[in-house]
């Protein structure tokens, strides 16, 4: 039996690419219709006025305006777009 391991492949070396989640437009920033405001997994931040919720829970603006974050009940946050 060989007392040295052959030149086999390592068991490491795999990783998934970053998902680039998080807030993309902060409070007070002007946005256009269709601008992504938050990318998230699940509804960590809930949609408010003038925003839409994508099927991957991405929140995006549905009209032109200014981003506004506000707290709601039970330690939840809501994001809205205040139209100009």
Swiss-Prot record:
Residues 1-25 are annotated as: Disordered. GO terms for molecular function: structural constituent of ribosome. Keywords: Ribonucleoprotein, Ribosomal protein. It comes from the Bacteria. InterPro entries: Ribosomal_bL27, Ribosomal_bL27_CS. GO terms for biological process: translation. GO terms for cellular component: ribonucleoprotein complex; ribosome. Gene3D superfamilies: 2.40.50.100. PANTHER family: LARGE RIBOSOMAL SUBUNIT PROTEIN BL27M (PTHR15893:SF0), RIBOSOMAL PROTEIN L27 (PTHR15893). Belongs to the bacterial ribosomal protein bL27 family. HAMAP family: Ribosomal_bL27. This is Large ribosomal subunit protein bL27. It comes from Dehalococcoides mccartyi (strain ATCC BAA-2266 / KCTC 15142 / 195) (Dehalococcoides ethenogenes (strain 195)). The gene is rpmA.
